[in-house]
């Protein structure tokens, strides 16, 4: 096997797949990338047995073959080479030679036959999703995923397929984030799947936005996302996601409209003097005014006041300031709506201009 590519052309697919490879592995071959050259196309595959990423690019000067090469070493070598370098990778027995100009590196390889693949994938549903739409779904919801929760089904992101729409939902039991986008032509089916945290993070890193349409395929135990140059596959979490619609506040008729960035800045300032353990802030709403206060065990106190468009006579409610800041960071609207019922009920935060998140 042999191929030659410009450094920048090789670096892009390498960067796409190398993050899938774990730094510590149970199998030595999992530290490697599967490298294949077939009919003028180079494919690079990385996996941790839960997530698999395959990146492809065209090569002109190439000889067909396949092997596995240490992922991070190859990536670091190519990244460290000068811009504009022509990189030639050659296989000689169980050794891989990487050459660029006067630089030459020799790496150990493992047989391609030892490289594991994710279980056989058979798609039961296929939908087309705008890349920008899927990127937005993940960016606006992934922050609310649980981390290492014993309720394992919360350690991921729910994809709720509903004929003409796709929803993403995440919750850690304290807060919930939801966003939806329209599907091109609809799906004709309904299904819920849970993608694990690492799969969500790798998919988010992969998506670039833009006008491209992605092929999203759902199998019995996997999700696959296809783009011209990349195929992403992830195992699913086998569990039932909570009935999230039951916890979305209904009847929250006390509405506050406020500038998102102004509220975010005020919360950040007030949080400096909040209790470091509980991170609580008190939000008081009165006609035309939003008052934020925080205090800590040292008897220190912060107060912020903001002009707001309110439909509330008077109400005080406590929040974890980190949860509010995460929600405001995920929204993109200039103004947000804070929908309240009473001091003991959940609050709803959403964009004032685009109410799909």
Where are these regions (language model features)?
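Structural preference for solvent-exposed beta-strand-turn elements
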Residues: 1-357
